[in-house]
Amino acid sequence: MADFMLEPKIAKLYRDVPLAQLEPYRQFRIEHDFKHVTVGGVTWEYYDLGSGPEARLMLTGALAIPYFDWHHLLRFAETHRVIAPCYPAVDTMDALCDGLAGILRHEGIERAHVQGGSYGGFVAQIFVRRYPAMTASLVLSHTQPTYPDDEGTVKLQRMLRLAKLLPAGALRRMLSLSLNRLMPEKTQDMALQFGIYAELLRVCLSKADILSILARTVDYEAYRFTPDDLVDWPGRILIMMTENDRTTPEEVREDFKRLYPQAQVHLFEGTGHATSWEQADAYRAVINDFLNGLNEA
């Protein structure tokens, strides 16, 4: 893949990133290109790394392109085949999940361990219900259940109607206002993450992409999940949360545990919504221990 740092507009966004952080990420982007497949008339891009006997379907967050996940992809690919898709501009969760299933079929993967963090956790919860036979296990990280009757859902619907009227620049600012509160403190250690965040928001995502992200969020909140949804599904579930994550206060964490009473739950401390960055090794260890336990059961 072409060196993104040769683009002055993009390189400027990474100017404050120390070379020790930037160079491994730069090499990842150069050495690993997206694969492409058309599913239902929609073109999908995705990473396909590793060659282990089992596969992981890694579902990225709201910004739709799995650049944030690069270091996890490399480490998980040491033991598993890893499929990490970008999200195209489709407006429903069903369409998104149908595309994901199409990628797996195209790659000859019958079942995968499905892992979703934040917005990717929304997608994962729909996927396991729509394609239970393709879901070997479910890892949900820093995400939440649906609240179809909540006032916040009504606000999301209004926001989507307004967003359609806005130019792309205003739409990016609106999305950043929503996401900024989930970002960690801007320290030197987090410089790369903030560079990636800026590139995704300012360069990578089009107006159509952002509108589809919002539309799928509204669509997700219309679902009504119950603890009985997966009663006949034989897979196991891991839920990871952090006690000070603004998206999952205590009442939401309790709702989540009631929705998935069979789940193994791990609670991190002090890292908010950014545990996968701030405690990357510990984050991966919890997931790997869970998957290793499946093989030992």
Annotated model-derived regions:
Residues 271-284:
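Catalytic histidine-centered segment of alpha/beta-hydrolase-like enzymes
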Residues 121-132, 138:
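Short glycine-enriched nucleophile-adjacent loop
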Residues 129, 137-167:
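Flexible "cap/lid" loop of the alpha/beta hydrolase fold
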Residues 38-91:
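Conserved HGGG/HGGXW glycine-rich cap/lid loop of the alpha/beta-hydrolase fold
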Residues 233, 239-241:
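Short beta-strand/loop motif that positions the catalytic acidic residue
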Residues 74, 83-115, 119, 285:
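Active-site loop/oxyanion-hole signature of alpha/beta-hydrolase fold enzymes
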